[in-house]
Amino acid sequence: TFYLGEFFGWNFAYQMIGIIVIFLCFIFLILIKEPTREIRPPKDFFKEPLGWFEDSFLAPLKDLYLRYKNHLLLLLLLIFTYRLSDMFLGPMAMPFYRETGFTKIEVAEITNFYGLIMTILGGLFAGASVYRFGLSKNLVAGAILTPLTNLPFIYLNMIGHDVNFLILTITLDNFTQGFVNVMGVTILGTIVSKSFTATQFAFLVALVSVPPRIVSGGSGIIVDNMGFHEFFIICALLGIPAIIFSIMAHKRRQELGFE
């Protein structure tokens, strides 16, 4: 996108990206076959509205509650806060790069292309680490790494335009993002029941999407009133609740199935 924006303008860049995404989605829809599975006929909404509502919504939530009971609040708080620090920083990353003096080409090459590679490597490392050390320890590690890897942005803001330090910052931040993304998906995959996978997964993903909706609007306000230095400090501090909840989950890993 940044390469196209640099040479052809943003209007052309976004049009081309939209066309490419639609084309790829169309190809995948054609090529990927749905898995064969036994489908239980759902209750008719018009004939049995209460039964339909119970099967579609109440039963999955009831199952989630009955399986975790006293630990459900901890799980929801962990899901809600686990990536809060990165979600708060995300909307202001691009304005920060531009204000610091990085060109579109530098942003494209370092934060997008190289950053994507580091995100993939972080995800692969997370999968191997979960296999070797288990889920709960890696949850704690991811919660600690997230605010720590936000701190280099503070120094980058102090020194200004420095390509080498931007590469180091993106290396640490995107690798951790890939690691934490896998942890987040693993949490959801561990919590959901096979009988209600779709509904429970949709509910939990919706819960995960709440933090960015709440906090992203405040990012720009804080930057305007306090500056990027204080903003990045706040981003790091927002990672503290996730550390606390992940440690609590680690202590209850047997009950939660996070071993």
Describe the residue ranges of each PLM region.
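C-terminal membrane-cytosol helix-exit motif in multi-pass small-molecule transporters
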Residues: 20-41, 245-250
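Short amphipathic helix-loop junctions that connect adjacent transmembrane helices
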Residues: 91-108
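Juxtamembrane intracellular "pre-TM" segments in multi-pass secondary transporters
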Residues: 36-74
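Helix-to-loop junctions at the C-terminal end of transmembrane segments
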Residues: 5, 121-138, 223-224
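A late C-terminal transmembrane helix in Major Facilitator Superfamily
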Residues: 195-225
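Intracellular juxtamembrane helix-capping segments at the cytosolic ends
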Residues: 178-193
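Helix-loop-helix hairpin linking two adjacent transmembrane segments in secondary transporters
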Residues: 1-32
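C-terminal ends and interior cores of transmembrane alpha-helices
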Residues: 144-161
